[in-house]
């Protein structure tokens, strides 16, 4: 591939990470949280930990939570769900909007339920804003406003998403610099915060500081070397396409789910572009791989600032 392969490693010169089997059971009240980039093996590690410690998995994935969005979300298979119960997978209707705050509320309820039955919750997911919301809470910025979101969507539809992103850049360049123009939901949210409060999203985040933990959490991730992770991404995309991903998206669009938040996620967005004639068939898989790798780079940026214990997993 033309771009440099990806790496998920604690340090290029570090010793090999320990086996996942060395992970100690959680202390009382401690929350095990499996993080890591797409295709690194989070689901398998979470299931093994649940099997080992008598636990259940709580998904922290902003696409897996929706029903109908199956192949391209990497949902656990029926066989995997038979090994460990999963929460917040196939939990809500595709057109229901779930943000980080609502996820944290749902996850807290699931964690309380699991612990109430004497079992161990294992959080697993690559939507790191959701993980942060659960572990650290969110900044006290103004709550979401559906009217503002609808207004911003109308601007994006009429003038293009780049135009909405430019509006954000004019008032909050720091947020605009970290958000892709196509990320309509997050661009709209950042712009909405400024419009409603007169302060940038970055200023709200700086004020919060995210220093007081709501949970004593231990972050775990699977170590993958560059070539291995790159291969896993390509194989995953190819496999999903062979299993009928295009047909799944075609069905979703035909049933009125074109405005579902998950339809704008990596992979689903590219398949939709293909079905709408904007992306040739022979360019579909490479486009999804490129978008996935871009997303993984953003995930890795977040991981670099966290205290993550890396383990080896076959």
Curated annotation (Swiss-Prot):
<dbReference type="Pfam" id="PF01715">
    <property type="entry name" value="IPPT"/>
</dbReference>
<dbReference type="GO" id="GO:0006400">
    <property type="term" value="P:tRNA modification"/>
</dbReference>
<feature type="site" description="Interaction with substrate tRNA">
    <location>
        <position position="127"/>
    </location>
</feature>
<comment type="function">
    <text>Catalyzes the transfer of a dimethylallyl group onto the adenine at position 37 in tRNAs that read codons beginning with uridine, leading to the formation of N6-(dimethylallyl)adenosine (i(6)A).</text>
</comment>
<feature type="binding site">
    <location>
        <begin position="36"/>
        <end position="43"/>
    </location>
    <ligand>
        <name>ATP</name>
    </ligand>
</feature>
<protein>
    <recommendedName>
        <fullName>tRNA dimethylallyltransferase</fullName>
        <ecNumber>2.5.1.75</ecNumber>
    </recommendedName>
</protein>
<feature type="region of interest" description="Interaction with substrate tRNA">
    <location>
        <begin position="61"/>
        <end position="64"/>
    </location>
</feature>
<keyword id="KW-0808">Transferase</keyword>
<dbReference type="GO" id="GO:0052381">
    <property type="term" value="F:tRNA dimethylallyltransferase activity"/>
</dbReference>
<dbReference type="GO" id="GO:0005524">
    <property type="term" value="F:ATP binding"/>
</dbReference>
<keyword id="KW-0460">Magnesium</keyword>
<comment type="subunit">
    <text>Monomer.</text>
</comment>
<feature type="binding site">
    <location>
        <begin position="38"/>
        <end position="43"/>
    </location>
    <ligand>
        <name>substrate</name>
    </ligand>
</feature>
<dbReference type="InterPro" id="IPR039657">
    <property type="entry name" value="Dimethylallyltransferase"/>
</dbReference>
<dbReference type="InterPro" id="IPR018022">
    <property type="entry name" value="IPT"/>
</dbReference>
<feature type="site" description="Interaction with substrate tRNA">
    <location>
        <position position="149"/>
    </location>
</feature>
<keyword id="KW-0067">ATP-binding</keyword>
<dbReference type="InterPro" id="IPR027417">
    <property type="entry name" value="P-loop_NTPase"/>
</dbReference>
<keyword id="KW-0547">Nucleotide-binding</keyword>
<comment type="similarity">
    <text>Belongs to the IPP transferase family.</text>
</comment>
<keyword id="KW-0819">tRNA processing</keyword>
